[in-house]
């Protein structure tokens, strides 16, 4: 039993060796066909271990072909060349600064020679070729594929050359130092593309708008809170309609002294309701010496002045107040005394060389003013600051 098993194993080993030998032959033939049909040959020797085996098999095949040719006299000797060495091509470096990719032109001629030699070869015996007919079909189809690859390479080369020429036409050659010496008056033109300058006034999502006009910014800051829609806390008017009551009272006092007008405290109609307005409609009067005035006459004179005066009149203090102060300072040199007769109910002005009488003060409640000499006399040159006027009124109240 063991002998039979060993015999079967020996038979299997022999069959495996035969199959391996056939596979090596097939691989060898395929590698030979691929080697002869290379489109672009290598410009250097690239030898490996499997190429040495191919070279030995190729030499054996050539020796067999020579023996067959010696038997027949009519057949001529053939030499098979497996290596395609390309011819070196001259490149014009002076004209072109760049070095584009060039494909050798003698590849097509070498391919045609190799295909002609393969066609003229006699048929190899069955031992060298084997029973593979597909290899012959591959060898016939390979030149067509090579032609297609050559056409593609030519089209790529022509496209690269045309692109390089167009770029070379657009870009001008730079001037050398010698050219400038020959033509010193030559005009130099800048061909480089102009840089786009981004404007700083563009509005972006990240950057805010930048205002370069200082006057515009100043007016914007001055008129920022001028037209606000929210009224004040304690008033029913808007900020741009607000009036200064202290300046208004002082102006009325000066006008009454200079122009024989009665003095009355009032506020605009918008800022006070009618109930409070009736309560505060109390007149002020001057007393000179020991003369006394009845309350009824005071009410009559106050009503007459209030009827003649409108509640909505607003005075432009910036224009009139400066002229009034100058006149008032001139009248301070003399004593101004107002007297009121009980019969006519009119004011009369008298001048005397004595001491000046006191100026009446303003308040919301009825005030009794007595004739007392001035302790403090001030010259008003500038009327714009309000703090001086407030301090002046407080000092006059304390003095009285």
Swiss-Prot record:
Upper taxonomic lineage: Eukaryota, Metazoa, Chordata, Craniata, Vertebrata
UniProt-listed Pfam families: DUF4545
Region (Disordered): 112-151
Ranges of biased composition (kind: Basic and acidic residues): 112-126
InterPro entries: DUF4545
Protein name: Uncharacterized protein C1orf141
């Amino acid at each position: 039993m063991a002998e039979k098993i060993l015999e079967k194993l020996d038979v299997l080993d022999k069959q495996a060796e035969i199959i391996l030998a056939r596979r090596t032959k097939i691989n060898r033939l395929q590698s030979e066909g691929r080697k002869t049909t290379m489109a672009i040959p290598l410009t250097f020797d690239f030898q490996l271990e499997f190429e040495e085996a191919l070279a030995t098999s190729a030499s054996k095949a050539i020796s067999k072909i020579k023996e067959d040719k010696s038997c027949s006299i009519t057949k001529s000797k053939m030499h098979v060349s497996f290596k395609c060495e390309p011819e070196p091509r001259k490149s014009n470096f002076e004209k072109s600064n760049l070095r584009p990719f060039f494909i050798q032109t003698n590849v097509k001629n070498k391919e045609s020679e190799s295909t002609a030699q393969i066609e003229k070869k006699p048929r190899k015996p069955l031992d060298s070729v084997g029973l593979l007919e597909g290899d012959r079909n591959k060898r016939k189809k390979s030149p067509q594929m090579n032609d297609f690859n050559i056409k593609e390479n030519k089209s790529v080369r022509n496209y690269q050359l045309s692109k390089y020429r167009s770029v070379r036409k657009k870009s001008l050659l730079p001037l050398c130092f010698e050219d400038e010496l020959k033509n010193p008056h030559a005009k130099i033109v800048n061909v480089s593309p102009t840089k786009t300058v981004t404007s700083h006034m563009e509005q972006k999502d990240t950057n805010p708008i930048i205002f370069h006009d200082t006057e515009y910014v100043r007016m914007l800051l001055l008129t920022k809170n001028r037209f606000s829609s929210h009224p004040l806390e304690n008033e029913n008017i808007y900020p741009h309609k607000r009036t200064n009551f202290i300046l208004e009272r002082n102006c009325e006092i000066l006008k009454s002294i200079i122009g024989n007008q009665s003095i009355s405290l009032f506020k605009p109609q918008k800022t006070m309701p009618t109930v409070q307005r009736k309560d505060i409609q109390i007149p002020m009067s001057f007393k000179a010496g020991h003369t006394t005035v009845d309350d009824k006459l005071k009410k009559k004179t106050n009503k007459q002045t209030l009827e003649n005066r409108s509640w909505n009149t607003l005075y432009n203090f910036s224009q009139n107040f400066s002229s009034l102060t100058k006149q008032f300072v001139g009248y301070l040199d003399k004593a101004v005394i107002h007297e009121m007769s009980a019969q006519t109910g009119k004011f009369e002005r008298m001048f005397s060389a004595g001491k000046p009488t006191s100026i009446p003060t303003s308040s919301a409640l009825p005030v009794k003013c007595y004739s007392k000499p001035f302790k403090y006399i001030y010259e008003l040159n500038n009327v714009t600051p309000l703090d001086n006027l407030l301090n002046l009124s407080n000092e006059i109240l304390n003095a009285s």
